[in-house]
Amino acid sequence: MLLLPAISLAVPDTLSGPEISLKDHFIVKNNLNPSARAARARSMMMPISRNVDRLAANADSILPFSISIEDTVISDLRERLERTRLPDQLEGSSWEYGTELDYLKALLDYWQHDFDWRAQESMLNAFDHYMTVIDDLSLHFIHQQSANEEAIPLLLVHGWPGSVSEFSKIIGPMADPEAHDGIAADSFHVIAPSLPGFGFSGKPTQPGMNPEKIALLLAKLMQRLGYERYALAGGDWGAIINWHLANHFPERLIGLHSNMMLAGQPDDPSQRDQIEPEEAVLVQARRAFMRNEIGYQQIQGTKPQTLGYSLADSPAGLAAWIVEKFHGWSDLDQGPDGNLDEVFTKDELLTNISIYWFTNTITSSTRIYYENRNVPASKPFGFIDVPTGAAIFPAELYMVPRAWAEAAFDLRHWTVMEKGGHFAALEQPVLYLEDVRNFFQLLRQ
């Protein structure tokens, strides 16, 4: 165990002046693209601060990027874990009060003694990462290009409490399907950004970064990358952000795939009442379940800064806050017999949690709930005239009847899955990938 002689207090950021930053703990990296290789050769001869200056000076610049967490930051994490003070738990209780104590103890012990961040860092760095600045905000993204010239550009958008690590099992098969038992016709150029305030992207310094504004930023990113038309996929906030993209720029989109469909009641009674019996049972069951799951939304939607002081300073608190969502929103028994280790490995969970910890973005990421609640969209939603496909996983948080989705979207594809939950790309990557491929095969024809 590595120890530090002193521990600095980690405090969540507050909204302040403009920020253009690559973050002190990260470095630029090489890429297969010849121009990127040349850029890397130049960048390695100058300090990080000058690379930051290059981004700030050239509004259209895109620099290769690599994740490289400093040893002292990892040591600080282990020291904090060593000093963890845990609460008690009621006898006979499990997850119904929140994160189960014995599970958290095991997770924290693994994080402190056995979790190999460098291995996970290397896994993530196997993808092609970049950084650019859009509207004075540094934006990190993976851009995994396919060798197939006919590949569809796919903007793959995560949510909360996720990150780009959610997509680590599907980016390779999407960009290079032939290397993963697929066919070249299913190729995608994958663009997977860290949302503003999440992970390796910059933190908004002014109020107002709601999902619509994020969508407009991502539209600018796709323009900067030279994609005139592209496709969308994602869940959670990613689904909502993509909804805004489709609402603003339907002419730019090839198609929209979602694993969290959202639609209100149609005005037409014939559509509103067109609910299959099995749909009604599932919708009601998920609504009942969500009544016990929305407490976090009330906190993050009203006082995210107050919550942040605890989570930014305690890795145990951060892990408990995030892992409870992975337990509650996944397809497993929610009682004492449910085993989260059978759904996600500890490495998968801790890679995502570590990204939040190392970047100190738990507070900035939760503000999206506040901004969504308090900053109305500038363009009301109408019918989404973009070919849309939906993957309906049984443990998804929100469910709508198919007829309601058809009233709101140009619905071309609807798959009801036998298993899986909210974090579909990580929990059921084979099913998720197959459904994305099947939907876009319809549009390629």
What does each model-found stretch correspond to?
Residues 212-230:
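Conserved acidic catalytic loop of the alpha/beta-hydrolase fold
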